Amino acid sequence: NAVYWNRRYDPDSIIKDKHIKRQLESININVRTFNASLLNEPWQIATKSGTPFRVFTPFWKAARAQPLTTPLPSIMPSSIFKTDASETLKDWNLTPSNPNWAADWSNYWKPGEVGAQAQLHDFLKFQLDGYGKQRDRPSLQATSRLSAHLRFGEISPLQILTDVTDYVRKKPHLSDAKSKFLSQIGWREFSYHLLYHFP
């Protein structure tokens, strides 16, 4: 028997996860945790003296110098532990109605991995070229709109980095836009680095 989960990096979650791990191991259940939300673990990027970074630019330079793992293909498990029947989300009456204040959300965000993939594809095809000049203009829809997908684990920063790099390899005139966009992924990494080391 084993339980697997993706690591979290804020202090309260680390404490909770360690407690859960101890409880499971006390009843002989193996626990394996993984990094699914960052390019590098917060403890993997350090200054030459071995201390955590406090400034973005040297942090991102050091992070980019790290070797990256190749994203693995999605593999469906051969079997999944069966659970007892439970209520559906529809049973909980969470879908808004009268008024349906969420009616337009589907125009802006398609939840799930498929929606994340489509959003990344559309961003690369239609918006990456102007990203450097347009990203700071709130009146334009010039950002990647991947934040929610990243937050909920529907796409990984490694997949974004890999897909953007592969796309720009075929369109080298976009290399400056690529650097500007990937630096935003870097800022996300840096925020986790700071959260972990300096909560």
Which positions does each model-derived feature cover?
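Glycine/tryptophan-enriched, flexible segments
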Residues: 51-198
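Trp/Phe/Arg-rich N-terminal binding region typifying the photolyase-homology
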Residues: 1-71
